[in-house]
Amino acid sequence: MSVTENGDDRTPSAPKHRQMLALLLMNANQVVSMAQFVEELWEYSPPPRAVAAVHTYVMQLRRILHGGATAVACGRLVTREQGYLLRVEDGELDLHLYESRLRAGRALLDAGEPDAGARLLRTADAMWSGTTGLVDAPTGPLLRAALAPIERERTEATVRRIHAELALGRHQELVSELCALVHQDLTHEELTAQLMLALYRSGRQADALAAFHRLRHALREDLATTPGPDVHRLTTDILTGHPRLEPPTTGHLPLTLDAVPTLVAA
């Protein structure tokens, strides 16, 4: 997380300041109540003077955000009867730009523009992986709840983008990325299926089958379940070398994407 104003770095360094600012940004232009601040900052064990501490943090945060110009900061971080509100203009928050690019990328995929859509989704994902993801800010229950749907949406967009790139014949370029993604979630069936296909198309049948066995083991150990029928069908096709798994011969998205696994979430 970073904050800049006219080229000057205004990013808070103290963990509580960063956490408070993250909560305000995730609720930009909306009032964050004192109760919400207390729950986020201290969860189940607030100090006796938690409300007073919040007021102090806000005062300090105002100074940080505007280099000591508290009068200016009060116009940005506004006091309300129930709590505080952070005013954010259009284009100021990277999260909003990230979400805009995500929507535009998906729209391009829907319109049959896989190359342009995939590029835009990659740009959006790079923004999230860089500064938008709040990776260096502490997160309490409210921030975790706010970030969860964004992370789900990000994963869904990644699956769609890779789906398009596989259909464009970019399997070799995708192997390393898919290995890293699957390593982060060993039970994710769609990403594993995409990894299996990318490996198979890259001439690595044994590695593709090994990816299936790792998925089956992880699902059994972590979720007490087994891979779905689509993954089993893909595994059979890999074992038999079914022609439908062959990579596309042109740089255009084929009329049918049956060769690219699209699994239905349980």
Identify what each model region corresponds to:
Residues 14-22, 47-68:
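DNA-recognition element of transcription regulators
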Residues 9-41, 61, 187-195:
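Short amphipathic alpha-helical recognition elements used for nucleic-acid or partner binding
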Residues 10, 26, 46-50, 74, ...:
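Intrinsically disordered, charged and Pro/Gly-enriched terminal/linker segments
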Residues 39, 56, 63, 210, ...:
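DNA-binding alpha-helical recognition surfaces that contact promoter or target DNA
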